[in-house]
Amino acid sequence: MRLWPQAWGAVRGAWRECFPLQGHDVARWFPGHMAKGLKKMQSSLKSVDCVIEVHDARIPFSGRNPLFQELLGLKPHLLVLNKMDLADLTEQQKIVQRLEEKGLSNVLFTNCVKDENIKQIVPKVMELIRCSYRYHRAETPEYCIMVVGVPNVGKSSLINSLRRQHLRTGKAARVGGEPGITRAVTSRIQVCERPLVFLLDTPGVLAPRIESVETGLKLALCGTVLDHLVGEETMADYLLYTLNRHGLFGYVQHYALASACDQIEWVLKNVAIKLRKTRKVKVLTGTGNVNVIQPDYAMAARDFLRTFRSGLLGQVMLDRDIIPAC
């Protein structure tokens, strides 16, 4: 929920202009070697007619693996920005324009939960294939599409959504809220009868080197790595910083806080109190150990992240500062 800036005029000057990035080692957050997955994708390319790259619509410019275009660049390519229901797309046209400037002219926004825009995928893919040379597959009556992307952006959900739309059937690919559900290039999964289209689901593959700590934090907020590798409280702090800077104060209403605040300790303390999340801590006193009840900051941080990821804090564009001003 976006409130009028005047509502928080008294505290507006307190928002941080930058997030402290020193002391964070992004290399420790992400798996350092995913070449095995890329090699398996390459070995399957001969039987592939088109590549669908799935990415999170909340970070259209951040965290995409550049190796996808380098290794799979000879094939027609469609970028699907999924989870559009969670993203603030008021600047969608500018986002598409910037992506086009980067050479990505085929972009589609989707919501696999409600099958939004899913029906556009097969016609778009068929158009791309018709405009390209199929080499030794020219006489093959069926089409094979490879689905790639970083972890937990909805690749398997996209496959299941396509099957619902075109085959009226159930799940064929496992899905989950954590990265790493798909661990290998799967066998072909049929998603359409006419035309006859099969998809290959692939494991999420991150770039060998994350470009910056801030990009790493954005990827972490979108669930591309396990939270404990980055630290829930660090992620919650970056989320709070982002929400306040963008004037998104839905967290105030959701947790019934007295006001917006830029201090993560204060926010998590009040969230823990609201949720009745506490823990016992032993404190050494002059008369011995005493059990003291304290707010559970870790549990509060996890809930803060969960509500963001489920959309309860409103639609958010984490790449807002990268969108062209005009």
Curated annotation (Swiss-Prot):
It comes from the Eukaryota. It holds the Pfam family MMR_HSR1. It is found in: Mitochondrion inner membrane. It is a peripheral membrane protein. Its main location: mitochondrion. Signal peptide: none annotated. Residues 35-208 form the CP-type G domain. Keywords: GTP-binding, Membrane, Mitochondrion, Mitochondrion inner membrane, Nucleotide-binding, Transit peptide, Translation regulation. CDD domains: YlqF. GO terms for molecular function: GTP binding; GTPase activity. GTP binds at residues 82-85, 152-157, 204. InterPro entries: G_CP_dom, GTP-bd, GTP-bd_ortho_bundle_sf, GTPase_MTG1, P-loop_NTPase. Belongs to the TRAFAC class YlqF/YawG GTPase family. MTG1 subfamily. This is Mitochondrial ribosome-associated GTPase 1. It comes from Mus musculus. The gene is Mtg1.
